[in-house]
């Protein structure tokens, strides 16, 4: 069994999605996992990969890769991050309605990079975006895409700031108490 097949079988066996796996320099094997929507996990509910998820997959992968005699010196297992790549058709279906960055293989209207909201369109996909003048729709297939990633959304509006300190009581003469 190849190292890719061993990694995929192990990750999916635990109920996670294998987003990407790659070999780096100096024997690095990097694996990105994600939780499958609707699946129940030991670490509790939540849509994001936890440290415990990564630890569990790492321990099993170390064992499997040793048994399969796969050559590597370092193993990294992590979540794909907020800017998760979209690789498969299932990824596009899962994240339809989300804001994405897309890079095309060939330029369209003089550009390769676009940002907008992903939508399904039969067998193909659409990106709804505004070019600064008007709303536009870019139709594309997965074969035309070089790279696609979710646009990270970081919301600080729910965070409460520190309450302003009350001014010190003033005594006549301008001195603080």
UniProtKB/Swiss-Prot annotation:
Protein name: Ribosome maturation factor RimP
Database matches in PANTHER family: RIBOSOME MATURATION FACTOR RIMP (PTHR33867:SF1)
Cross-referenced InterPro entries: Ribosome_maturation_RimP (IPR003728), RimP_C (IPR028998), RimP_C_sf (IPR036847), RimP_N (IPR028989), RimP_N_sf (IPR035956)
Function noted in UniProt: Required for maturation of 30S ribosomal subunits.
Keyword Cytoplasm: yes
GO annotation, biological process: ribosomal small subunit assembly; translation
Key words of the record: Cytoplasm, Ribosome biogenesis
One Pfam assignment: DUF150_C
Highest taxon listed in the record's lineage: Bacteria
NCBIfam families with a match to the protein in the record: PRK00092.2-1
Keyword Cytoplasm carried by entry: yes
Gene for this chain: rimP
Cellular component GO terms, alphabetical: cytosol
Gene3D superfamilies attached to this UniProt entry: Ribosome maturation factor RimP, C-terminal domain, RimP-like superfamily, N-terminal
Family: Belongs to the RimP family.
Subcellular location: Cytoplasm
